[in-house]
């Protein structure tokens, strides 16, 4: 993943522009992560959904900037964020006028290195009971392990998740990022 500065970092702005072009050409919705205020200003109104990744959940200036738009936002939970911290991060977006927020449980940091993270399935019913936000689950990042994606997807839907987000590639083993947790 992008935790290492030596890992593939994605195509950045060029990649966002490619996605926008593909979305227009094939009339498909485009969701991608934006990591800077500059990117939000440049691409925020051109995307169907903006994703705020786990490392930026605490980037309050970035959250305020996406809050100024009407574009829906997927807000991923921080690696060690409590439910309250996650919901307060959503408030930064909401307080700027954007109520189109989708929360994404993507696993929290644990001590056992067997899986990349630990899927907090309890987050789903908690968010459903205590907020009006839709919640989706990312079992790919929660485990970092391909064979766990299907059973955790089923568990997430059973717990009440509004959707699932998974890493996919036509040839997962060739994926430049997150190959171990990518399905075909």
Locate each region found by the language model.
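Glycine-rich, proline-tolerant flexible connector loops at the mouths of alpha/beta enzymes
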Residues: 1-14, 169-182
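Glycine-rich phosphate-binding active-site loops on the catalytic face of alpha/beta enzymes
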Residues: 54-58, 156-181
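Catalytic beta/alpha-barrel core
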Residues: 28-36, 48-61, 71-83, 102-106, ...
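Active-site beta-loop-alpha junctions enriched in small/polar residues
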Residues: 1, 35-37, 55, 78-80, ...
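Conserved, mostly hydrophobic/aromatic
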Residues: 43, 75, 127, 138, ...
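Catalytic cores of alpha/beta
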Residues: 38-46, 83-89, 144-161
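Active-site/ligand-binding-proximal alpha/beta "capping" segment
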Residues: 94-155
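Glycine-enriched alpha-helix->loop->beta-strand junction motifs that scaffold or abut catalytic
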Residues: 42-51, 67-73, 94-100, 131-134, ...
């Amino acid at each position: 993943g992008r935790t290492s500065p030596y890992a593939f970092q994605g195509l950045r702005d060029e990649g966002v522009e490619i996605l926008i072009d593909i979305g227009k050409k094939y009339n498909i919705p485009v969701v991608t992560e934006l990591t800077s205020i500059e990117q939000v200003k440049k691409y925020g109104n051109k995307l169907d959904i903006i994703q705020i990744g786990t490392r930026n959940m605490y980037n309050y200036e970035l959250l305020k900037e996406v809050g100024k738009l009407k574009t829906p936002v997927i807000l991923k939970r921080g690696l060690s964020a409590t439910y309250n911290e996650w919901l307060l991060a959503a408030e930064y977006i909401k307080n700027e006028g954007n109520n189109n927020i989708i929360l994404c449980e993507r696993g929290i940091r644990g001590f056992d290195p067997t899986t990349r993270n630990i899927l907090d399935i309890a987050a789903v019913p908690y968010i459903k009971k205590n907020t009006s936000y839709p919640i989706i689950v990312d079992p790919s990042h929660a485990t970092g392990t391909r064979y766990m994606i299907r059973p955790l997807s089923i568990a997430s839907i059973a717990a009440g998740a509004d959707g699932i987000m998974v890493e996919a590639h036509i040839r997962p083993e060739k994926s430049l990022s997150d190959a171990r947790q990518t399905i075909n």
